[in-house]
UniProtKB/Swiss-Prot annotation:
EC number: 2.7.2.15
Protein name: Propionate kinase
One Gene Ontology biological process: propionate catabolic process
Gene: pduW
Role according to the record: Works with phosphate acetyltransferase (pta) to capture exogenous propionate and regenerate propionyl-CoA during degradation of 1,2-propanediol (1,2-PD).
InterPro entries, alphabetized: Ac/propionate_kinase, Aliphatic_acid_kin_short-chain, Aliphatic_acid_kinase_CS, ATPase_NBD, Propionate_kinase_PduW
Metal-binding found in the keyword field: no
Signal peptide limits: none
Reaction equation(s) it catalyzes: propanoate + ATP = propanoyl phosphate + ADP
Pfam families (UniProt xref): Acetate_kinase (PF00871)
Length: 404
């Protein structure tokens, strides 16, 4: 028996969706509604054989969901709203409260809204998306899938910051980590491809894109991750600085009379590859500029790789070794240059890349005699969300639900 599961990622002015047939994992359609709240919202829906695009007024998220469901019916992707057996919602922050994906109830939704202080730009609109789908599809269970939940296995010395204790006890300031859905999915696929239980592996997963994070996974548990209290911390990213000396901020604020909001803008939107290269936040553009001799672009690419290498080294020490290094995300999946730079001169760890395999994006790119497997695995957060819906809302199907 198959089930139609919808995976939803609600943004402040957008709604990204995918409809999957489970447990096969087949994508039936995917799409995006952008510029919600505007008279010229953009609607894009794609199947394997067709693509529809139009510009229409979309007043709010309720309008967006209503429009989406109307289009699915109108394009005969579904015959009835009852065809949708469950809905999985990506939620940015689960705090310490949610340690796994969970079936949405009124109390669950209220708790997600209470956690908005930890993710003020994301949790409120995630909650709104859940609320609208529960209203319009009352017979389809909703499951909340948290970016932070996979990292709730971190040990206390790993997630506590060396600040006065009250900031953790009273305000919840600690390392939470993000990209958990991606890290969980990719590590599971890796174990399937190796034919080894994840519980027997030491894995470092590099999710590299405009937002990047590294995760150390030992015996199937996240034991460290580069993003912390916010997704701004960790390694260098497209427009985010990652970790820097915190005293730089008050120094800049005093010199340039910047407000906290302006400093946040600087760290989140003007730094990283964009800030150092002066070219772009897109790795491909920076790579192209570096190939033409742009010194700052070359420096940006070197910094990007070196921050990742330093993180990998510390995680290997923490886990007492490494069985597999995995690349995923837009850059990790598509840039042979980035993968090569990250793995450069790591032969002493038993880690070496075969450049011919690397250039053709093979699944495993390590040399024949390397001790550490090096894999390139496409992430699929939507499929992971759908699998969690199957596991939690339709538990009788759990045994059928495996990574594709």
């Amino acid at each position: 028996m198959s089930y139609k599961i919808m995976a939803i990622n609600a943004g402040s002015s957008s709604l990204k969706f995918q409809l999957l047939e489970m447990p096969q994992g087949d994508m039936l359609c995917q799409g995006l509604i952008e510029r919600i709240g505007m008279a010229d919202a953009q609607v894009t829906i794609k199947t394997h054989s067709q693509k529809w695009q139009e510009t229409v007024p979309v007043a709010d998220h309720r309008d967006a969901v209503t429009l989406l469901l109307e289009k699915l019916l109108g394009y005969q992707i579904i015959n009835s709203l009852r065809d949708i057996d469950g809905v999985g919602h990506r939620v940015a922050h689960g705090g310490e409260f949610f340690k796994d994906s969970t079936l949405v109830t009124d109390e669950t939704l209220a708790q997600i809204e209470r956690l908005a202080e930890l993710a003020p730009l994301h949790n409120p609109v995630n909650a709104l998306g859940i609320h609208v789908f529960r209203q319009l599809l009352p017979d389809a269970p909703s499951v909340a899938v948290f970016d932070t939940a996979f990292h709730q296995t971190l040990d206390e010395p790993t997630y506590i910051y060396p600040l006065p204790w009250r900031y953790y006890a009273e305000l919840g300031i600690r390392r939470y980590g993000f990209h958990g859905t991606s890290h969980k999915y990719v590590s599971g696929v890796l174990a399937e491809k190796l034919g080894v239980p994840l519980s027997a592996l030491r894995v470092i997963c590099c999710h590299l894109g405009n937002g990047s994070s590294i995760c150390a996974i030992k015996n199937g548990r996240s034991v460290n991750t580069s993003m912390g209290f916010t997704p701004q911390s960790g390694v260098m990213m497209g427009t985010r600085s990652g970790d820097i000396d915190p005293s730089i901020l008050p120094w800049i604020a005093q010199r340039e009379s910047k407000t906290p909001q302006q400093l946040n803008q600087l760290l989140n939107n003007e730094s990283g590859l964009l800030g150092v290269s002066g070219v772009s936040s897109d790795y491909r553009d920076v790579e192209q500029a570096a190939n033409t001799g742009n010194r700052q672009a070359k420096l940006a690419l070197t910094l990007f790789a070196e921050r990742i290498r330093a993180t990998i080294g510390s995680y290997i020490m923490q886990m007492g070794g490494l069985d597999a290094l995995v690349f995923t995300g837009g850059v990790g999946e598509n840039s042979a240059r980035a993968r090569s730079a990250v793995c450069h001169n790591l032969q002493f760890l038993g880690l070496a890349v075969d450049e011919e395999k690397n250039q053709r994006n093979a699944t495993f790119i390590q040399t024949e005699n390397a001790l550490v497997k090096v894999a390139v695995i496409n992430t699929n957060e939507e499929l992971m969300i759908a699998q969690d819906v199957m596991r939690i809302a339709l538990p009788a199907t759990e045994g059928l639900c495996v990574p594709a």
